[in-house]
Amino acid sequence: MSDITVANYHAFPDARGHFGRYGGRFVAETLIGPLQELAQAYDAARHDPDFIAAYNKDLKDYVGRPSPIYHAERLSRKVGGAQILLKREDLNHTGAHKINNTIGQALLAARMGKTRIIAETGAGQHGVASATVAARLGLECVVYMGATDIQRQQINVYRMKLLGATVVPVTSGSATLKDALNEAMRDWVTHVGHTFYIIGTVAGPDPYPRMVRDFNAIVGREARAQMIEDYGRLPDAMTACVGGGSNAIGLFHAFLNDASVRIYGAEAAGDGIATGRHAASIVAGRPGVLHGNRTYVVCDDDGQILETHSVSAGLDYPGVGPEHAFLADSGRVQYVGIRDEEALAAFHLLAHTEGILAALESSHAVAHTMTLARDLPKDALVLCNLSGRGDKDVHTIAAREGVRV
């Protein structure tokens, strides 16, 4: 990576939505106006005490925040080395971190007078969270989901429908998350007058990367205060899984200026980087443009986006949020690839030692947390963002292991 020197990581993005050489708005002319309108509305809302109060009230009373930090004592003993701590985003209403963002964006949609929200989803958690807040606020909700992901996440598809959402299968391309995002953006261009697009990750054109980060930053702010209150200090290291990267940046952001905290992002290495069947945009990708922003992407020598693979639908995406690309280049965050088999092993070990079923996405972070812990002393603290629960993945894991459920 480069020799970028950063004095204050909280100073990004700049006024044009750039994180160093990443980010920006690489979109069709028809989207420039709607994006400017959205940016102006968001900037006004985030400085409005009434909006912030309403958002914080929903986080407390509807989402159930704060989420606790749990000391995984049996897992720590089994792994050996450092103490493993879990930030329990899986305990939120709807079962993942996604609701932190959808609550904020739905409140913004209502403030802007929009009556319809659309969303894309991979693992289904963002779709469920979007359908949930739409039901609460009385908004129409349409969720775009790749046909491949619909097959491996049927429980979440049914949950969305129970909540009143329309789920639209996307069959183009690889029929996964990137294709769902493409279709959602087409819908938004066509119906922008009354429609608000709730992007679920820190990707897309400005202002989405910063807006989604800001709504998820509650995770890191809570964790920082909890670490100081419960342990008297910050963690020695932390990990989170990275697909688009919303849960990760939500945790990382509060700690970016704390040089003593080592930060790691766990990308999906799938069947292994060398096989080409992976979704590791930073570890094995290169700079390019995808979904309206410049970032790291999985592409060929001509810049064409390649199909990706991960056992985890939520990490099966050929790009990453531009802030993560910037953090990788600056050296502040180290990104590693975790293979499917490593994530599955971590899933089972956490279940057996702590009675917690982690999402397959989160299991990538758990796997790297265990690797870090083994090489650290017993009094070291490693914090892992347990971004979601694994109920949605039981059928996928059972099928992979030849079990009928």
Swiss-Prot record:
The modification N6-(pyridoxal phosphate)lysine is found at K98. It comes from the Bacteria. GO terms for molecular function: tryptophan synthase activity. CDD domains: Trp-synth_B (cd06446). Keywords: Amino-acid biosynthesis, Aromatic amino acid biosynthesis, Lyase, Pyridoxal phosphate, Tryptophan biosynthesis. The keyword Transcription regulation does not apply. GO terms for cellular component: cytoplasm. Its EC number is 4.2.1.20. Its cofactor is pyridoxal 5'-phosphate. It holds the Pfam family PALP. Disulfide bonds: none annotated. InterPro entries: Trp_synth_b_CS (IPR006653), Trp_synth_beta (IPR006654), Trp_synth_beta/beta-like (IPR023026), TrpB-like_PALP (IPR001926), TrpB-like_PALP_sf (IPR036052). The keyword Transferase does not apply. Tetramer of two alpha and two beta chains. The beta subunit is responsible for the synthesis of L-tryptophan from indole and L-serine. PANTHER family: TRYPTOPHAN SYNTHASE, TRYPTOPHAN SYNTHASE-RELATED. HAMAP family: Trp_synth_beta. This is Tryptophan synthase beta chain. It comes from Xylella fastidiosa (strain Temecula1 / ATCC 700964).
